Amino acid sequence: MAEAALEAVRSELREFPAAARELCVPLAVPYLDKPPTPLHFYRDWVCPNRPCIIRNALQHWPALQKWSLPYFRATVGSTEVSVAVTPDGYADAVRGDRFMMPAERRLPLSFVLDVLEGRAQHPGVLYVQKQCSNLPSELPQLLPDLESHVPWASEALGKMPDAVNFWLGEAAAVTSLHKDHYENLYCVVSGEKHFLFHPPSDRPFIPYELYTPATYQLTEEGTFKVVDEEAMEKVPWIPLDPLAPDLARYPSYSQAQALRCTVRAGEMLYLPALWFHHVQQSQGCIAVNFWYDMEYDLKYSYFQLLDSLTKASGLD
């Protein structure tokens, strides 16, 4: 009887993503031709937890005309920034039986630009991706070129962003599939970002496993050493590559339906909290994003319930 009840729960979980998709998940990421009003943004996008791409949202930013690799070289080239370095472009990702975190180096931005332009070489793949508001903390000289927040979003959400992050890296740098507890406004200033999404309702089809955390260490010879972080707890992470999923190992993922979009220069993506996302980029893509903490309300509680049931039922 207990097994029958458990199978009934599994059946409901398998059917839930399709039901949610029919009710509230778009078939493609919609476009807006201009920034929404605070009311429109909150009512039509934040409340229903739906992504959108907003055109003409950055037109008033000087950065849109000024930011380029030559401009960075002239204005902040001598500034040292934190750079994630990995052998294959995957930072904070599952590699083998480890959750691998990048080696972190402090490098002059001019050297990063040299690598991006093919003037210099460095072992591995470089990505300026340190979060925790690396734009104001590491590159404050660039702040006059953009707004410190997104006014209509700040008004709609009733708060200021927790972090303003700067992103610059090689085309080989990839962000593995994951979710965040932030309302994310992702602004591409130059180049393109390629996103793959899953709504939170796809959680029953998205596997998680526990991994020993480890960090890449760059040796003097230019090779990478894996160092286990023995003092840290195991990390739950998604082992699956959505671009080449191992369906023999994770057959349930075949029932998930991803959305894909490309965010181009001058466009802003609203990525709702709890949406799973995987990110690629063009070479030397320049982007800034604003993280607004989500409301930990009933919507969050329902997702936690879905997550817990997925784990308890053995679908994970």
Curated annotation (Swiss-Prot):
EC id: 1.14.11.63, 3.4.-.-
Effect on the protein upon substituting C47A: Impairs homodimer formation
Superkingdom of the organism of origin: Eukaryota
Keywords: Aminopeptidase, Cytoplasm, Disulfide bond, Hydrolase, Iron, Metal-binding, Monooxygenase, Nucleus, Oxidoreductase, Protease
GO molecular function: 2-oxoglutarate-dependent dioxygenase activity; aminopeptidase activity; endopeptidase activity; metal ion binding; monooxygenase activity; peptidyl-lysine 3-dioxygenase activity
Ranges where the JmjC domain occurs: 128-307
Protein name, per record: Bifunctional peptidase and (3S)-lysyl hydroxylase JMJD7
Species, as recorded: Homo sapiens
Lineage of origin: Eukaryota, Metazoa, Chordata, Craniata, Vertebrata
